[in-house]
């Protein structure tokens, strides 16, 4: 899992 995935891939 990547940081942008955790953010909600906006």
From Swiss-Prot:
Its main location: mitochondrion. One of its GO terms (cellular component) is mitochondrial inner membrane. Keywords: ATP synthesis, CF(1), Hydrogen ion transport, Ion transport, Membrane, Mitochondrion, Mitochondrion inner membrane, Transport. It comes from Yarrowia lipolytica (strain CLIB 122 / E 150) (Yeast). This is ATP synthase subunit epsilon, mitochondrial. GO terms for biological process: ATP biosynthetic process; proton transmembrane transport. It is a peripheral membrane protein. The lineage of its organism: Eukaryota, Fungi, Dikarya, Ascomycota, Saccharomycotina. F-type ATP synthases have 2 components, the catalytic core F(1) and the membrane-embedded component F(0), linked together by a central stalk and a peripheral stalk. The central stalk, also called rotor shaft, is often seen as part of F(1). The peripheral stalk is seen as part of F(0). F(0) contains the membrane channel next to the rotor. F-type ATP synthases form dimers but each monomer functions independently in ATP generation. It is found in: Mitochondrion inner membrane. Mitochondrial membrane ATP synthase (F(1)F(0) ATP synthase or Complex V) produces ATP from ADP in the presence of a proton gradient across the membrane which is generated by electron transport complexes of the respiratory chain. F-type ATP synthases consist of two structural domains, F(1) - containing the extramembraneous catalytic core, and F(0) - containing the membrane proton channel, linked together by a central stalk and a peripheral stalk.
